UniProtKB/Swiss-Prot annotation:
May be involved in plant-microbe interaction. This is Protein RhiA. Keywords: Plasmid.
């Protein structure tokens, strides 16, 4: 059996691209895909997460894409997305590994365009419409003075699903510099938005896209290691 899960939202990304420079709009329009096959000895939940080049204190990676059920031996799942960035927030309580981050609000943004937002509780918790600000190339979230500590979390996502999040708090500033690094993994008890403890993830491998390659195939082998090649 093969399942295809697409996170490409044409209407959303066209709108987000409309105000961006040509080069940024072109990049955001590129579709990527990962086809993950299970040739191991048992069923697994397959998921994809992003990982920062260097660890950043109090910033957590999320299970970005995740199979909705275990993938049986001999079956596969395909994830498709675009380089379309978003701001996200959630009422998580204290942000620790194992907590589920459900994006209660999403705002489209771009590192080269509208890259700055404010998270506030005025008229209910939420993010303001992004505006262009400094520094260019980063995504910035300002927490307002009415944001309590250890209640909400904010972060960034791609194709409408969270990738990195941090605990929100009174007058805090969060600056994210997007450097997509895709990792695939096989596990259990994982869902979209699960807050991950990167150091404890097993059966994982980075999925590197070579120049001009946008589709990869990852095969979980009998020894529970991943073999990754262009599609």
């Amino acid at each position: 059996m093969s399942l295809h899960v697409s996170y490409v939202d044409k209407e959303m990304t066209d709108h987000a691209r409309a105000s961006q420079p040509g080069s940024a709009a072109l990049a955001q329009g590129t579709q990527y895909s990962l086809l993950l096959k299970n040739q191991s000895a048992q069923p697994w939940t397959f998921y994809v997460y992003q990982k920062m080049p260097q660890p950043v204190a109090n910033v957590f990676s999320l299970a970005w894409f995740c199979s909705p059920y275990q993938i049986r031996v001999g079956n596969q799942i395909k994830f498709t997305w675009e380089l379309a960035y978003n701001f996200v927030w959630s009422d998580t309580g204290q942000l620790i590994p194992g907590v589920d981050f459900f994006a209660s609000g999403v705002e489209d943004c771009s590192p080269s365009g509208r890259n700055t937002t404010t998270f506030s509780l005025s008229d209910g918790p939420g993010l303001t419409a992004p505006i262009k600000g400094d520094p260019a190339g980063s995504l910035v979230i300002n927490d307002a003075g009415n944001v309590p500590n250890n209640r909400f979390s904010v972060g960034i996502g791609m194709s409408g699903t969270g990738t990195y999040v941090a605990q929100a708090g009174t007058n805090l500033l969060h600056t994210f510099t997007p450097t997509p690094s895709y990792w695939i993994a096989a596990g259990t008890n994982v869902t979209i938005g699960s807050v991950l403890s990167i150091d404890t993830i097993t059966q994982t491998r980075e999925a590197k896209f070579p120049s001009a390659v946008f589709n990869l195939v990852g095969v979980l082998q009998e020894d529970n290691t991943w073999d990754i090649n262009p599609a």
